Amino acid sequence: MPPEDRIRLRHMLEAIENASSFITERKRGDLDSDKMLLFALVRCVEIVGEAASRLSGNAQDSAPTIPWAAIVGMRNRLIHAYFDVDTEIVWKTVTVEFPALAIQLRRLPLNEA
């Protein structure tokens, strides 16, 4: 796997890990009252989507069970419809989808030459 792909995959994992740390001891309702938390989580989702969009086709093909188009689509939705962010979807993405995605990403050759 080219170094650029490995870097982007690591960026995805770092953003997922950051999101996980941000929600420690938090509840869904905190997104409604804590704008900084919401902005931080949205940014993590954007980074995951942007990094995914810049992966080579070969990198994406090496993990066909990862929903690459949906990941990139989520990023695009957050960027272009910033005025209409669904906090339920952000919370589900970070609490349900991200942990599952992290497991899949860790199976990829992130440190190989």
Map each language-model feature to its residues:
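Solvent-exposed interaction patches of small proteins and small membrane subunits
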Residues: 1-113
